[in-house]
Amino acid sequence: MNVSQIYARNGELFSGRICKQKRQ
């Protein structure tokens, strides 16, 4: 597994959390 792949997964989860918080 490449570090970029791990960052991509974490980025999706992190961005998703931020989007949810921004919506609220």
Curated annotation (Swiss-Prot):
Swiss-Prot/TrEMBL induction comment: Expressed in both exponential and stationary phase in rich medium; expression is considerably higher during exponential phase (at protein level).
Protein name, entry field: Protein YsdE
Lineage: Bacteria, Pseudomonadati, Pseudomonadota, Gammaproteobacteria, Enterobacterales
